[in-house]
């Protein structure tokens, strides 16, 4: 099964509102790519509105009022899940953004960390699997079925191994990128995600 974030809420009385004078910092994360999108603040009313409307709403410290992200631009954040940290004084919000989150037109208010593109690629492959746009190589792979996709993974694996032995670094990187892409497609064709494979790696590491 694909690792879909579970919708969850937090209970207001369980949170430590006193530490921040009635405000809690809120880290917003893309529910699909897991990229951190922004930091905001919520009071209890903002949290209630967020849970009720399913649109992420903050408390503006400068304007001294509630504001729903994207209320003017339309670039709202659709709530998927809310969790508190171990001290109950910080919230992690998983959301699906409609458009860029940053007011500068960027996906995130923070620069992308190396490796984060894999999450975005996994989400894009999932979108291709759902929507099947024409003239898409990914769509063509899905329509050929699991056997063909698995065959491509095998071919790319062999080419990557050969590049690692007898070719230059650029060739090895190119083949590695092809292998990763086709592996993500294979996982999606089986109803799985890259996150599922990462979960297995994490379990082995413990």
Swiss-Prot record:
What is the enzyme's main class? hydrolase
Q: Where is this region: Phosphoribosyl-AMP cyclohydrolase?
A: 1-117
EC number(s): the record gives 3.5.4.19, 3.6.1.31
Which Pfam families does the record match to this protein?
PRA-CH (PF01502), PRA-PH (PF01503)
**What domain of life does the native source organism fall in?**
Bacteria
Alphabetized UniProt keyword annotations: Amino-acid biosynthesis, ATP-binding, Cytoplasm, Histidine biosynthesis, Hydrolase, Multifunctional enzyme, Nucleotide-binding
- Database matches in Gene3D superfamilies: MazG-like (1.10.287.1080), Phosphoribosyl-AMP cyclohydrolase (3.10.20.810)
Biochemical pathway:
Amino-acid biosynthesis; L-histidine biosynthesis; L-histidine from 5-phospho-alpha-D-ribose 1-diphosphate: step 2/9; Amino-acid biosynthesis; L-histidine biosynthesis; L-histidine from 5-phospho-alpha-D-ribose 1-diphosphate: step 3/9
Q: For this chain's UniProt record, which GO biological process terms are given? A: L-histidine biosynthetic process
Its localization reads: Cytoplasm
Q: Which reaction does it catalyse?
A: 1-(5-phospho-beta-D-ribosyl)-ATP + H2O = 1-(5-phospho-beta-D-ribosyl)-5'-AMP + diphosphate + H(+); 1-(5-phospho-beta-D-ribosyl)-5'-AMP + H2O = 1-(5-phospho-beta-D-ribosyl)-5-[(5-phospho-beta-D-ribosylamino)methylideneamino]imidazole-4-carboxamide
Instruction: Please name the GO terms that the record assigns under molecular function.
Output: ATP binding; phosphoribosyl-AMP cyclohydrolase activity; phosphoribosyl-ATP diphosphatase activity
A GO cellular component term found in this entry reads: cytoplasm
Give positions of region: Phosphoribosyl-ATP pyrophosphohydrolase.
118-206
Database matches in PANTHER family = HISTIDINE BIOSYNTHESIS BIFUNCTIONAL PROTEIN, HISTIDINE BIOSYNTHESIS BIFUNCTIONAL PROTEIN HISIE
Q: Which family does it belong to?
A: In the N-terminal section; belongs to the PRA-CH family. In the C-terminal section; belongs to the PRA-PH family.
- This chain's protein is named Histidine biosynthesis bifunctional protein HisIE
Question: Can you name the source organism?
Answer: Xylella fastidiosa (strain Temecula1 / ATCC 700964)
Give the gene that encodes this protein.
hisI
């Amino acid at each position: 099964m694909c690792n879909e974030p579970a919708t969850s809420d937090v209970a207001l009385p369980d949170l430590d509102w006193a530490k921040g004078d009635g405000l809690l910092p809120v880290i917003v994360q893309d529910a699909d790519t897991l990229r951190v999108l922004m930091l905001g603040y919520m009071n209890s009313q903002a949290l209630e509105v967020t849970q009720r409307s399913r649109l992420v709403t903050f408390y503006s410290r400068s304007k001294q009022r509630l504001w729903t992200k994207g209320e003017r631009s339309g670039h709202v954040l659709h709530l998927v899940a809310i969790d508190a940290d171990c001290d109950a004084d910080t919230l992690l919000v998983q959301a699906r953004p409609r458009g860029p989150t940053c007011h500068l037109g960027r996906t995130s208010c923070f620069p992308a960390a190396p490796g984060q593109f894999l999450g975005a690629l996994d989400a894009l492959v999932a979108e291709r699997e759902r929507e099947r746009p024409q003239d898409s190589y990914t769509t063509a792979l899905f329509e050929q079925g699991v056997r063909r996709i698995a065959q491509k993974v095998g071919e790319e694996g062999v080419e990557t191994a050969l590049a690692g032995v007898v070719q230059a670094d650029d060739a090895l990187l190119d083949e590695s990128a092809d292998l990763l892409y086709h592996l993500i497609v294979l996982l999606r064709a089986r109803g799985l995600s890259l996150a599922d494979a990462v979960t297995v790696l994490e379990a082995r590491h413990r």
